[in-house]
Amino acid sequence: MVDVAESRRTQRAEGPRTIFAIATANPPNCVEQSTYPDFYFKITNSEHKVELKEKFQRMDDKSMIKRRYMYLTEEILKENPNVCEYMAPSLDARQDMFVVEVPRLGKEAAVKAIKEWGQPKSKITHLIVCTTSGVDMPGADYQLTKLLGLRPHVKRYMMYQQGCFAGGTVLRLAKDLAENNKGARVLVVCSEVTAVTFRGPSDTHLDSLVGQALFGDGAAALIVGSDPIPEIEKPLFELIWTAQTIAPDSEGAIDGHLREVGLTFHLLKDVPGIVSKNIDKALVEAFQPLGISDYNSIFWIAHPGGPAILDQVEQKLAFKPEKMRATREVLSEYGNMSSACVLFILDEMRKKSAQNGLKTTGEGLEWGVLFGFGPGLTIETVVLLRSVAI
């Protein structure tokens, strides 16, 4: 007779849930923020909107972004004039781009992550793919399975239309899969392209213009599992605890809708205030059981929705100037890449920690936190990624 309790127990991993590899990828087209307003208003035939262009220039100047990477080149946009108009029917053209570029960019990051991991891809048991850039069937998870040559029976999870908080969501799901499936090795891929949100400017919808100043394209990939193989798998961060919550009284703060005109985004001005007002509660829930109340003593990875959010969080928690260094660096060099952003920040942090000779992947600190913020307003907390010695 089979012992059901024992059967359940043997299916669970015993060791810590660990990130073994991180890699990123971007399209080759690099856009300098300082000259982007000229390009944007020219390509959208909006140069006559002088005052609006001046507003957009100020947005770009305040964004704290130096450059972004975008799949959409001048040539592609000229071939698709409806994509350049404000609210012109264009979903078919956008979808044609999305179904190719999201898996392609995701593959580029995944190949790098698998190489760093150092194990054959046949050992990947689960695949999580996340994108806010569109929907299709079979999904980007299926396309990636084919592009990477993964086993046909790999267990796939496709997450569409989640938004900027989803970098935390994929880690939460990967943690649960790794700890409840002994021997699991989870490939996580977030791939985002702005082809679905790009459109010309409007005098009456400045929140749309904010998105045009912030969003960039990028993909990030991770390998997650439990019980590292000694001398072969190298732990980078441990996933300790996760949570998701909806901020009270935040309905409509951030939302997006897939329409015939593409994906439209709407933001309330008080998004930074909502985030900063609710972050204390999330931190207490996460760190009180660990006896941690000094949030300057942990390393920070926060989704860089924009500089105003980071400024208010820093002020609210009385942060030291360098506390958000990795987050601000990624915002500066890549812009807001939605779900992929926090994974880029993880990569930036562990690389700089090694370059600076620090004792852990988390800027020399033992404990840390990862936050994702997005539509809902939804807050994802990953408590946090405990760093291990380099």
From Swiss-Prot:
GO terms for molecular function: naringenin-chalcone synthase activity. One of its GO terms (biological process) is flavonoid biosynthetic process. Pathway: Secondary metabolite biosynthesis; flavonoid biosynthesis. Its EC number is 2.3.1.74. The active site is at C164. SUPFAM superfamilies: Thiolase-like. Pfam families: Chal_sti_synt_C, Chal_sti_synt_N. It comes from the Eukaryota. InterPro entries: Chalcone/stilbene_synt_C (IPR012328), Chalcone/stilbene_synt_N (IPR001099), Chalcone/stilbene_synthase_AS (IPR018088), Polyketide_synthase_type-III (IPR011141), Thiolase-like (IPR016039). It catalyses: (E)-4-coumaroyl-CoA + 3 malonyl-CoA + 3 H(+) = 2',4,4',6'-tetrahydroxychalcone + 3 CO2 + 4 CoA. The primary product of this enzyme is 4,2',4',6'-tetrahydroxychalcone (also termed naringenin-chalcone or chalcone) which can under specific conditions spontaneously isomerize into naringenin. Belongs to the thiolase-like superfamily. Chalcone/stilbene synthases family. PANTHER family: CHALCONE SYNTHASE 7, HYDROXYMETHYLGLUTARYL-COA SYNTHASE. This is Chalcone synthase.
